[in-house]
């Protein structure tokens, strides 16, 4: 257990360097998450006989990836950075990977911002290619938590988004303080558990859009629990009633999921 407790003292978040640029494990895990999510989508399309071509799915994931990156970064800038004014007056800095002449990559992404970017990209894609948005979103409802699992493991390997100080025996020492490995809690609850639930439930879904609505609700419960073990975002702390920004945004997401579920269910029962 001691080796586990001090894992950060023995693990380098940089996987390797190439031409002087450091490649972090987080970046590799992000790429792995995307590749596996796409592979899962293609598996489900074939397994469940969903009328979507492989080429169209590739195009969709390309659109979505752009939306996710833009949304995640802008969400962090506007909500979490504490320097929104600086970035808005110097927008070129939002995606600038250099700092004082050193390549540091793009740091700071927001999950809920990524969700907004993902939804906008899906809407635009479906209008462009005349696809059923709810059918695509249901497919993503299973693939997202599958890939998300590896994204949170990437956060753990990158030594970021630490948990709160604790005395549990499996705590990770971070700058001399024992903390919850909350990134792994999130990988399990927000990723793996939700994936398994929706993967198994997909055979019983009653209408298109049901899975993505359930995902929004399930994610809220999982994130709400995990936030009690995760250190609040620096500069924000607790917002109201002892809740973090992540919990508040997740509650909004849950409300939207419930609204969508009820609306689509009523439409389904009228058929």
Curated annotation (Swiss-Prot):
Its EC number is 2.5.1.145. Pfam families: LGT. A 1,2-diacyl-sn-glycero-3-phospho-(1'-sn-glycerol) binds at residue 152. It is a multi-pass membrane protein. Pathway: Protein modification; lipoprotein biosynthesis (diacylglyceryl transfer). It comes from the Bacteria. GO terms for molecular function: phosphatidylglycerol-prolipoprotein diacylglyceryl transferase activity. Keywords: Cell inner membrane, Cell membrane, Membrane, Transferase, Transmembrane, Transmembrane helix. The chain crosses the membrane at residues 18-38, 60-80, 103-123, 136-156, 181-201, 209-229, 238-258. One of its GO terms (biological process) is lipoprotein biosynthetic process. InterPro entries: Lgt. One of its GO terms (cellular component) is plasma membrane. Coiled coil: none annotated. It is found in: Cell inner membrane. Belongs to the Lgt family. Catalyzes the transfer of the diacylglyceryl group from phosphatidylglycerol to the sulfhydryl group of the N-terminal cysteine of a prolipoprotein, the first step in the formation of mature lipoproteins. This is Phosphatidylglycerol--prolipoprotein diacylglyceryl transferase.
């Amino acid at each position: 257990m001691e080796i586990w407790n001090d894992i950060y003292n023995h693990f380098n978040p940089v996987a390797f360097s190439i031409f002087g640029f450091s490649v972090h494990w987080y970046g590799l895990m992000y790429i792995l998450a995307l590749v596996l999510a796409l592979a899962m989508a293609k598996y489900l399309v074939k397994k469940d006989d969903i009328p979507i071509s492989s080429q169209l799915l590739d195009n969709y994931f390309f659109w979505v990836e752009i939306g996710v990156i833009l949304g995640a970064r802008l969400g962090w800038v506007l909500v979490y950075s504490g320097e929104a004014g600086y970035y808005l007056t110097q927008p070129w800095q939002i995606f600038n990977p250099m700092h004082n002449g050193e390549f540091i990559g793009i740091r700071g992404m927001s999950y809920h911002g990524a969700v907004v970017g993902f939804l906008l990209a899906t809407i635009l894609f479906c209008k462009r290619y005349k696809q059923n948005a709810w059918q695509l979103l249901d497919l993503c409802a299973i693939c997202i938590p599958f890939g998300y699992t590896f994204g949170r493991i990437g956060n753990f390997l990158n030594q970021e988004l630490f948990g709160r100080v604790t005395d549990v025996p499996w705590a990770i020492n971070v700058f001399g303080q024992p903390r919850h490995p909350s990134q792994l809690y999130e990988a399990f609850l927000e990723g793996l558990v939700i994936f398994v639930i929706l993967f198994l439930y997909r055979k019983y879904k009653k209408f298109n859009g049901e899975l993505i609505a359930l995902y929004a609700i399930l994610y809220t419960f999982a994130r709400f629990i995990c936030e009690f073990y995760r250190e609040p975002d620096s500069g924000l702390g607790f917002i109201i009633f002892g809740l973090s920004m992540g919990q508040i945004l997740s509650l909004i997401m849950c409300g939207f999921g419930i609204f969508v579920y009820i609306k689509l269910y009523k439409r389904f029962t009228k058929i």
